[in-house]
Amino acid sequence: MTSLNQRKDRLEFNKLQKRLRRQTGSAIVDYNMIEDGDKVMVCLSGGKDSYTMLDILLSLQQTAPIRFELVAVNMDQKQPGFPEHVLPNYLAQLGVPFHIIERDTYSIVKEVVPEGKTTCGLCSRLRRGTLYGFADEIGATKIALGHHRDDIIETLFLNMFYGGKLKAMPPKLLSDDKRNIVIRPLAYCAEEDIAEFARLKGFPIIPCNLCGSQENLQRQAVKEMLHAWERQFPGRTETIFTAIRNVQPSQLGDLELFDFVNLAIDKTATAVEDASDACAVPNWHRPAQEEVVQYVDVLDIH
């Protein structure tokens, strides 16, 4: 019985690994994230996402039709209790080239951010600036971050609800100074899959003592909302992500993205055969009453 369970577990693990490899490979190809000769700086925090990203990239590196270099980089921010030996030991065992950057951003954050306030914003800005500079130093052509599909979707709603912007987290980004390209190879991967993969692989997870135990209330609220939607309407998360990749500016309202001001009638265009029916909603498109109730429930956001 134990042998049977082990074979079943191995089969499930193989399916999960193949799915993550396929999704990561698709994202890399779709956005041309990694090119021949690239030196990719893989940013490791010690969390499940970055461990999974490195593992999958190492696997893809063996079979990719192009040659690229991977260099792991961790930033030791001098947080109390940070286990400095964990990542060096892990990376040395893998045989992966790595660098540990030591920057005492912890003291800066604690000095600047009032007690009880979320430190994530300032902490990430300080970390980003350091990583950008270090990428220049080592000649990295791409900076890989471990954000996944759920991070991207949550960021979309955070910006909508709290920032008044239709803005998410792009799979590929040119930095403001145009000196660095940031890639997110796990952009197509679900957090649930990543968490399970990390558990099965037994990665030596390092908790963040600075912000990991500090609940980011806004992001947590959005995460819970999305989980509730997914339970009630399975597949909704993937549909939202599909929408992020299928933007139609003419159906929104941003004057910078679409020239609404200069819209003009073109009488030479082919006319609709029966203009009286052009704006009618066909019966097949009319939702059933129970469907209407469901959509109203979805909008009841507290």
From Swiss-Prot:
This is tRNA-cytidine(32) 2-sulfurtransferase. Keywords: 4Fe-4S, ATP-binding, Cytoplasm, Iron, Iron-sulfur, Magnesium, Metal-binding, Nucleotide-binding, RNA-binding, Transferase, tRNA processing, tRNA-binding. GO terms for cellular component: cytoplasm. [4Fe-4S] cluster binds at C120, C123, C211. SUPFAM superfamilies: Adenine nucleotide alpha hydrolases-like. Its EC number is 2.8.1.-. Its main location: cytoplasm. The keyword GTP-binding does not apply. Pathway: tRNA modification. It is an enzyme of class 2 (transferase). Pfam families: ATP_bind_3. It is found in: Cytoplasm. The thiolation reaction likely consists of two steps: a first activation step by ATP to form an adenylated intermediate of the target base of tRNA, and a second nucleophilic substitution step of the sulfur (S) atom supplied by the hydrosulfide attached to the Fe-S cluster. Catalyzes the ATP-dependent 2-thiolation of cytidine in position 32 of tRNA, to form 2-thiocytidine (s(2)C32). The sulfur atoms are provided by the cysteine/cysteine desulfurase (IscS) system. It comes from Cellvibrio japonicus (strain Ueda107) (Pseudomonas fluorescens subsp. cellulosa). The gene is ttcA. A motif (PP-loop motif) lies at residues 45-50.
